[in-house]
Amino acid sequence: MKTFEPKPWVVPQPVLIIGTYNKEGVANAMNAAWAGQWDANEIMISMGKHVTTDNLKINSEFTVAFATKKTMVAADFVGIVSAKNDPKKMEKTGWDIEKATKVNAPVFTDFPMTLECRIKEKFNESETGYYLVAEIVNILVDEKYLAEDGNPDMEKMELIVFDPIHHGYIQLGDKVGNAFSDGKALK
């Protein structure tokens, strides 16, 4: 096996779009990949210093949308362009924007699934950013992405993940097994 120095190569990394409002109520979005489930109804996100972190100082509520093959170009755009430098950033995405149902934050309706969140805790704050733990207050799913059982269907969504090794986006594929079940064959 070839060896490598430590790198941020935990994979897959989700492509998450964090939605916030500024003090004037204008929607903003940023792309984040360093995030994950923290507890049953909580997530953790590593936040760098951005317009989004400034907005979260004003209002601790935000949304998290899951990027897809269809939203990839605009999702990448909001990760490389700051609202500080481009006030028309959100217009350029072409996304439809509505107010979330349970938190004071924008929902980008072009995405199949969105978490409505509220910050519970920030830690390791520094000049460059912080980590946040947020409560999932509500989950919105476009009905065309529901399975026959009424729950979200990950395969229908065409979700993408970030490849931190080659700096690409990869679409998630097909279901290959049943969690907490298939391993029983080895008992």
Give the location of each predicted region.
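Basic, polyanion-binding surface patches
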Residues: 1-187
